[in-house]
């Protein structure tokens, strides 16, 4: 989870900075080309914070960066630096709402539906297998070599993967840069694309207009928090529900930690009790990341004692 920082200290995994930088068509092309391992040319400028809504009664979504290639393929790139347990189903919902906007009302041939990519870049491992990249396409269970050619692809990228030999060096460097967006890291890469992205990052951080937008967003978030606290004082039941949601999140994290550790062997009762008894949400988040990286239960136990 990324702490509150000044604009100059933000990493590219931060959603605000990511949207600002990827608003540049060339930078967006560079990022997509690195991720997909092929040269991508965009048809028009990307749209950041693009909203999709199918009805006033349905939940809308706001995509970080939406773009369309010259071939008509559509892309949504999302930066995720806050741990969430619903990203898999969220990607399904994003896919459905994005698809709903791609065909004109009178089009009857669904083969005209654009190919699409949902790309989520996270600074934690959603699946716990230490991969930099997880790519999902629909396949037939009864015949594993039979794909469902619906043109939909969902990719989850993990900045902390360990399978360097299975992905390109440029992708590894890009994901490392997403989480460590510094002059030093940019200077160590041999990728011209990453260096161009870094130039755009520095330009955004120096921009007075971007700085004003960032300050405004921070003020709006703070105002929302204050308003939420005031409303909570007025409505004790609301506060109770909020506490319930926080406890619910922590319970999910406790379960996720234990699931990851169970993959490494039998979890001792005393360690299970320690995890179940932890009440600090930030500590649980840190333990979850440690469990995802641990090579053994003993390794995890040693780390949390430090």
Which role fits each region the language model picked out?
Residues 2-8, 16, 68, 75-80, ...:
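Short, charged alpha-helical interaction segments and adjacent helix-coil junctions
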């Amino acid at each position: 989870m990324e702490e509150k920082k000044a604009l100059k200290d933000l990493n590219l995994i931060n959603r605000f900075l990511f949207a600002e930088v990827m608003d540049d068509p060339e930078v967006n092309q560079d990022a997509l080309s690195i991720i997909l391992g092929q040269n991508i040319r965009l048809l028009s400028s990307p749209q950041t914070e693009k909203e999709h809504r199918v009805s006033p009664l349905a939940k809308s979504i706001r995509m970080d960066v939406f773009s369309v290639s010259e071939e008509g393929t559509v892309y949504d790139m999302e930066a995720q630096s806050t741990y969430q347990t619903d990203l898999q189903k969220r990607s399904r919902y994003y896919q459905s709402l994005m698809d709903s906007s791609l065909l004109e009302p009178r089009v009857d041939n669904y083969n005209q539906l654009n190919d699409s990519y949902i790309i989520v870049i996270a600074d934690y491992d959603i699946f716990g297998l230490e991969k930099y990249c997880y790519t999902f396409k629909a396949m037939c269970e009864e015949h594993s070599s039979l794909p469902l050619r619906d043109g939909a692809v969902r990719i989850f990228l993990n900045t902390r993967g360990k399978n360097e030999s299975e992905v390109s060096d440029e992708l590894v460097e890009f994901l490392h840069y997403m989480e460590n967006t510094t002059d030093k890291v940019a200077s160590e890469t041999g990728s011209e694309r990453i260096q161009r992205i870094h130039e755009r990052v520095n330009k955004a951080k120096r921009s007075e207009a971007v700085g004003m937008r960032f300050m405004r967003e921070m003020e709006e978030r703070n105002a929302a928090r204050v308003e939420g606290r005031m409303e909570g004082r007025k409505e004790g039941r609301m506060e109770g529900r909020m506490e319930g949601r926080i406890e619910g999140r922590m319970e999910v994290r406790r379960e996720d930690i234990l699931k990851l550790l169970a993959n490494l062997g039998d979890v001792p009762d005393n360690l299970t009790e320690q995890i179940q008894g932890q009440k600090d949400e930030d500590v649980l988040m840190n333990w979850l990341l440690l469990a995802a990286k641990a090579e053994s239960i003993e390794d995890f136990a040693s780390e949390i004692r430090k």
